[in-house]
Curated annotation (Swiss-Prot):
PANTHER family: DNA-DIRECTED RNA POLYMERASES I, II, AND III SUBUNIT RPABC5, DNA-DIRECTED RNA POLYMERASES I, II, AND III SUBUNIT RPABC5 FAMILY MEMBER. This is DNA-directed RNA polymerases I, II, and III subunit rpabc5. It holds the Pfam family RNA_pol_N. GO terms for molecular function: DNA binding; DNA-directed RNA polymerase activity; zinc ion binding. One of its GO terms (cellular component) is RNA polymerase I complex. It is found in: Nucleus. Coiled coil: none annotated.
Length: 70
């Protein structure tokens, strides 16, 4: 859904790096090079960005169930 603010393992702040990571991927960086450019050296922090699935845009397409009027 939304990228976590901190790494689950070490507690480093990573929430502010998501947009920069996506922009680096847009300009043809590889995943590893983009993470290196963001100074994410620990594998626990790297996995937080690599394994994140951004579902918020897909979920916004659904509306809550409307109540039926009699």
């Amino acid at each position: 859904m939304i990228i976590p603010v901190r790494c689950f393992t070490c507690g480093k702040v990573i929430g502010n790096k998501w947009d920069a990571y996506l922009s680096l991927l847009q300009i043809d960086y590889t995943e590893g090079d983009a993470l290196d450019a963001l100074c994410l050296k620990r594998y626990c922090c790297r996995r937080m960005l690599l394994t994140h699935v951004d579902l918020i845009e897909k979920l916004l397409n659904y509306t809550p169930l409307a109540t039926k009027s009699s």
